[in-house]
């Protein structure tokens, strides 16, 4: 291989990343126009397009490199020199951290995810940690309450770039001040001020103003979701000022925000203060840098593994028919491997399961479907695997495992946030907690359905409970679009004997679903049945589901709120 080619390859990879992130920012910058035009289908399509950009540009760079090298193989020394040249390009580069992830992706594509060593890849960053604590251009603007909070908020709202009319700006400001007064008290509020991000955060049908409420006793989140009326007028739906509320808004079960971030590391650093419970990976995920979030997630895993004395075990809960799930007892993620063979009732292929997980990645998750990171050739030290889990892996997924002596390589797996399985949660709670869980479960089903997602298998074991008490779906092998399902009423029996027969007295075709049957497995527990009938009886009616299908086919996009209905100003103050 000619000398000097290493620098050309390094420059080609970085230029490829520049092109990718330029397109990323271009798609993101259209969020305001899509919001103002209320083009919600374009919002959904832009989200999918932006997700695809990364892999598309990795592919373009790989083809360029194959042309540059004429398809010749490269030795280890050559690859190390390429990485050295690439590292030298990064100290003054504004998006160095994602550029490192892009380099990793190109390498993995070229070498089929093999020989993934710290010498060849940026397993950990080459740059100083949190390099962007100081940046040339401020990310946010400060607003002080010298003339009262009504005046402050009027300036904040007047500063927004949105070009639509407001329905009633004074009313919304009054509601915000009322909320802040109730939260902080008059004296504390008078001594507080705001710091507001320069860019709005767009997602679904809302534009979010994100800020920091700086009080004498500390800094709080300040989040305002801006929506449109049917007449295209703007209004503020609520004001959120707790870290728990902010954590849910930026949660792992929600779609990525569209926020213009030429310096993503700086934005992540700015967000940390109001999202103290979020990891670096989760913050990058929230702003749409999902591939770099995968890098950070892997780094978090490695750091945890180095500092613990735990072994991987099978995850708690009912064993799945399609996925083998394992975890580290103290780590907040689970690792999911597709089994070699499925239970007989699961008539699907591994490719179908992968397609379902990709569908979830690209779809609006409405706060009810956990995001995942997909890995190939994932290496585990045998000493970190419990004997029982090793036996289970070899029994259920041997075709996906390569034995390297002291290590195993799992050809393909997903990493996902760990939650308490809903069936276990329901066994452990009583009273209001039980009621809240059943309400959350039904709301999760409704919101998924409104977003054109039918879970398929609605058993409690396929849902989890987050640390904030939200119910989230995480078993995707039977997922499909609502519009693909035929919701039917069970025909009346022809004879009394029909109801006692082992086989149904009516024909059942692929895609047929009978909501009346949900009652049999969702209401069997006498503690749960009455609550379900009280709050969610309409889920057992086929006409409820058909009405939702009609709205979807008519092009209606439902509103999705990242907070409780009772927190909306229209409910709370009217």
UniProtKB/Swiss-Prot annotation:
This is Isocitrate dehydrogenase kinase/phosphatase. Transmembrane segments: none annotated. It catalyses: L-seryl-[isocitrate dehydrogenase] + ATP = O-phospho-L-seryl-[isocitrate dehydrogenase] + ADP + H(+). One of its GO terms (biological process) is glucose metabolic process. The gene is aceK. The lineage of its organism: Bacteria, Pseudomonadati, Pseudomonadota, Gammaproteobacteria, Enterobacterales. One of its GO terms (cellular component) is cytoplasm. Keywords: ATP-binding, Cytoplasm, Glyoxylate bypass, Hydrolase, Kinase, Nucleotide-binding, Protein phosphatase, Serine/threonine-protein kinase, Transferase, Tricarboxylic acid cycle. It comes from the Bacteria. Disulfide bonds: none annotated. It is found in: Cytoplasm. The active site is at 371. ATP binds at residues 315-321, 336. Belongs to the AceK family. GO terms for molecular function: [isocitrate dehydrogenase (NADP+)] kinase activity; AMP binding; ATP binding; phosphoprotein phosphatase activity; protein serine/threonine kinase activity. Its main location: cytoplasm. Bifunctional enzyme which can phosphorylate or dephosphorylate isocitrate dehydrogenase (IDH) on a specific serine residue. This is a regulatory mechanism which enables bacteria to bypass the Krebs cycle via the glyoxylate shunt in response to the source of carbon. When bacteria are grown on glucose, IDH is fully active and unphosphorylated, but when grown on acetate or ethanol, the activity of IDH declines drastically concomitant with its phosphorylation. InterPro entries: AceK_kinase, AceK_regulatory, Isocitrate_DH_AceK. Its EC number is 2.7.11.5, 3.1.3.-. It comes from Escherichia coli (strain SMS-3-5 / SECEC).
